Amino acid sequence: MPTLRTTYPGWICAFACACGSLLFSPPSVATNDYGLPSLGAASTSVSNEEYRLGRAWLRQFRAQAPQWQDPITNDYLQSLIARLAPHSDINGLRTITVMVDNASLNAFAVPGGVVGINSGLFAFAEDEGAFVSVLAHELGHLSQRHYARGSARAAQTQLPAMAAMLAGMLIAASGGGDAGMAAAMGSQAALIQDQLSYSRLFEQEADNIGLQAMADAGYDPEAMVRMFSAMQRMARLQGDTPPEFLLTHPVTDNRLSAAQARAAQLNVADAYTSDTLYDMMRARALLSIY
């Protein structure tokens, strides 16, 4: 298995910082207990800002990233997404696929319908069902507009957190000493914990959308459970240096158990996978890696 870790070049970091200033307008929908739009509510529309952000990202990607130029494999990737899309609640969103010439395990979805994979995903996923489970999860992120909702949540929490931190600094400056610094540090910790909580919620939503889409499209949702188990084993083996995908998509015991329970509830009609075709595409990816 090739090395499964990516160090992102400076242009990606710079682009991410620029994107941070593009806060999307939160949709006017019912919220759940976490203060986020309820599951399914966020899939009603894609804003112009999301389209612009996605196209800006795509221009940067095509100019800077090492692309895997393989039309045959890209056609295969598009066919898998086309099979999942009608069942993924993306409301006719036109998707664009990109492939990265990188041996690390990674897949991503960018606002506006850009779906990408690393060639290393083929190396890690042993069958078509496992590979599709990752695509279904990423389409779930697009369906629920997680980037837009995350930006909206950040806008809601950062100012209160900053106010609390400044208040703590004022206490310290006024002679409060340790108490003031503790208040300032506590506000920062609370903000980080809030972000982690919403990240876990987003992963659960994307899992649920993905599992249902797999079943409706004729894929065995248990393939996602198998993929999660394989990812969890990799994370444990690699310790402090897991691939970037597992840093942004951590597979916890709770997440694995939830996926197992959900998959067991789903029925698959007309199940079909083409592992022979997948094996051919996987071989092409392995040749490009080595």
Task: List the model feature ranges, each with a label.
Residues 39-44, 55, 67, 75, ...:
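Extracytoplasmic and endomembrane cell-envelope/extracellular-matrix remodeling and assembly machinery
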Residues 117, 133-141, 145, 206:
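Active-site recognition of the HExxH zinc-binding catalytic motif
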Residues 116-133, 196, 201:
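Short pre-active-site segment immediately N-terminal to the catalytic Zn-binding motif
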Residues 2-108, 191-192, 234-237:
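Hydrophobic or amphipathic, alpha-helical segments that drive membrane association/targeting
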Residues 158-178, 182-192:
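Membrane-active amphipathic alpha-helices enriched in small hydrophobic residues
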Residues 129, 139-156, 174:
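Catalytic Zn2+-binding segment of zinc metalloproteases
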